[in-house]
């Protein structure tokens, strides 16, 4: 490949090669390779999906009413979003509208997933890319208490004694030699910039979040029977309502259980307000003060989402996180996105391990083909079963390359918030709350927090702050906060509707396949925790003729396309300086901001390919 320019980036594969394999993700496993120059700045990035999903093939010929139960197993963390996309796709194909109660219950379940997933992502999968756990042992508990009260004065757990107790527990844990999730971190790396007190505060909240998250998912067990993988139903939700029912034999949804749901929603709201959002604002401020605003990639230019959380069911114009597409960083123009339009969403495979008749042409998901074609490029180092270095000039990933009108796009909470901000600036009242959150965050990061900490104030605009690893992490926290607030309204609407006498939870008018047309096609979209999720289905003679999923990591983790355009993962790493390539904190920090999650092994390689060191990636 050597060097070429695309999307405003100058790619150059000369220089030292670093291989991260695997950086796991929910839909399989991901590998990442980068080249760094003499100054340890990333000049080339290659993202590889190393595992074939293949569920689309499994679904062919099956009953479309069962599809949700299969596709839900794509993911065990963002549990439920694939089921929701699937039932929406089938309902769209068969023109089924669900009852109001079912809509509100689905909304509560979807937002529960969002807040749970975002909290687990930040505190347990991503925070340690920002937080030096060992540094927390050096913290002054009194100063930590003062810091807590500066950034979040309403949080009740903020005494010096509380932080001293957590610090002592951490010290005993470290001295035991059994570090568990803290094993093999890059503790002491100069890539970490937080003072000891901020590290102790963050570790403390890591433990608080661990306790709370297990309670929040019980909302799924009430409405969906279990978690992970709660039950869904084409036409509604599989739970009956009886407000006056009591005991185990009563209908699953009664006032006792609804009160339990309300208590969890209140917990979520308080945690987001007093812990999650303040933590991200404080950490983001301190890294911004250190000049670390890297990782923006495609977020600075091209973002996409389908829109979610309608204020009025089946009315996309009332989406409280409105969708669309922004190109070339122009926040003054939002293009409408229609997932049914064959000229808008297309998947390419010129650099993917799949086969099309003509690989210079993209296919709309309704016409998608999932035929594997595992071939390695001539410059690949290693073997078919043990690749040492990818040849990105050839096919190099099990992920296809989705494009919107030919453009590579970033999806996720950051994309949703950039779009919401753009919509609100143009007068969309339903997007006003995200705009308020963003403007408050900018004021806190630029002025309020630096002033409270005795640091110089800054004047960064949202357009400078948001397209970054910090911005991507902040958007998740703000979305979690917003979802908690919307859940509060959903709960009150649900109870009011039931008390008005409506107990319907399913529309079964078209449950019998005899009522279906001989052929139908539909699409279901969801604002999944990691980004824009779409399921496309074709139904023929009562069976699935074709099924395609385009998941968030397909968009973000996509390889190059036939024009050489890089995907969001690859773009986000470009031009990032590394303190020490043998401890690639910066690579993990940015990749984890997309939430590829979970533990994996990292191998750091020299330009000649010999291994320098082996480390564990959280």
From Swiss-Prot:
Substrates-to-products reaction catalysed: H2 + A = AH2
InterPro entries, per database record: Ni-dep_hyd_lsu, Ni-dep_hyd_lsu_Ni_BS, NiFe-Hase_large, NiFe/NiFeSe_hydrgnase_LSU
Gene Ontology molecular function: any one: hydrogenase (acceptor) activity
Cofactors, names only: Ni(2+)
Cofactor note: Binds 1 nickel ion per subunit.
Protein name per Swiss-Prot or TrEMBL: Uptake hydrogenase large subunit
Entry keyword Protein transport: no
Gene Ontology, cellular component aspect: plasma membrane
Gene name in the database record: hoxG
Protein's organism: Cupriavidus necator (strain ATCC 17699 / DSM 428 / KCTC 22496 / NCIMB 10442 / H16 / Stanier 337)
